[in-house]
Amino acid sequence: ALVLGAGNVASISAQDVLSKLFNDSCVCVLKMNPVNAWLGPILGEAFAPLIARGFLAIVYGGAEIGAWLAAHPAVDEIHITGSERTYDAIVWGDTPEEQRTRKSAGTPRNTKPVTAELGNILPVLLVPGPYSTRE
């Protein structure tokens, strides 16, 4: 699985890798977001046993590296924490025109399974309880 690391929160890349490795039983390549590239060597040390056994690789680069990896035949699924714009570029195509055309036709450029958290859209559950007005 390709894990495209987040740029907004440093810890998310590690969480995403651990989830893919242990919850989904995937071998992973983590492409660090350039904003958090400084964290790559630290994750490399923390995950050294996984890297040594071939379960994880950490790579660096910009959008062109991410696009190349997303299209690589050895990558069978993708996880992204990022923007809707990046998701659309990976799944539907590079330009807004290509994306509109492909969305209308229902023909994604990339047909690999993609999981994504885009724009910090997280579920919130409200459980009835004895809350004060302030709570």
State each model region's role:
Residues 49-135:
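Conserved NAD(P)+-binding/catalytic subdomain of aldehyde/semialdehyde dehydrogenases
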Residues 1-54, 121-122:
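Conserved small-residue-rich beta-alpha loop and adjacent elements
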